[in-house]
Amino acid sequence: MTLPFADSAQSTLGIEWELALVDAVSGELRSEAPDLLRTLHATEGLAEDDVNPHMTSELLQNTVELVTGVHERVDAATADLGRIAARVADAAAARGISLFCQGTHPFADAIAQPSTPSERYDRMLDLTQYWGRQLLIFGVHVHVGLDDVSKAMPVVNGLVNRVPHLLALSASSPFWAGTDTGYQSQRTLLFQQLPTAGLPFQFQEWEDFERCVAQMEQVGMIADVTECRWDVRAVPRLGTVEMRACDGLATLEEIAAVTAYTQCLVDDLSASLERGETVEVLPPWHVQENKWRAARYGMDATVIVDARGTQVPLAEHLPAEIERLTPVAERLGCAAELAGVQAMIDDGGAA
């Protein structure tokens, strides 16, 4: 099997924002996404097309996903996202609906939420049963372009090392069905129950990734590569790597901060590969432990930062990361947005 990697300009980016529709008075979920999307897609400038869908349905009828176009700068991408969100919010308000985003809804009954009719979703729910019907979750996904397919797997591996950092920054789902779970990201624990979700396998070469996908299709694990729902993944049809570990974020400022951090990480990893350097691959047992710690403790987590087992509090390691990446951010034009990471750290994480 070959998976062609689309042409993409280095470090261009796009953002996906999953939003819940809730009653403006009670905060209860409202399963009106199909009707709302029909209205919005008939609005000038928001019609769905192959290049820029703007907004799409999701697994549940209480959710809409907003999708930016391709941008070079974080400020342009977040402005695009804000424009779309404002149009959606206006249309929703006319129905008595507000937009809501955290990693989970704090008190709703997940099982009671109707799913969106779709062959793909129906197949997933039939396969995963109880756990699939628990996926009342919302996230922010960031795509960053790569100009060479040979960079894809090393960059994915490098981003995996920073999953706990981005997860802890964004963790916003301590409550589930009205209960304080004791975790900062209940969303993380729920989503990884799917057999093709969670942390990705670590490959060095694109051909190894192609071989894995081919074998997964052969034995019926997935229908195609889009069903690899990993926390970090390469997206061949877009020529990007995608960071999917973040909980839902409530503000554009927070989205801008995690987007800038992700863009800077990818650009820095790409530059190191161009210099002939190798990307450190943490042992999978360290990667798995780091993810769990971030989900459990959020910004209070201590993470393992190298193969020797060195441990550093995230609240110390992240500021050092931001300082290290600031020259990259200045070159990319996202220094102000990257500085927003420190503001999130000072606040203890996401709103």
Language model: regions and residue ranges:
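Metal-dependent DNA replication initiation modules
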Residues: 102, 106, 119, 123-140, ...
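Well-ordered mid-protein domain cores that form the structural environment of catalytic cofactors
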Residues: 69-137
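C-terminal accessory/tail domains of diverse enzymes
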Residues: 1-95, 124, 191-351
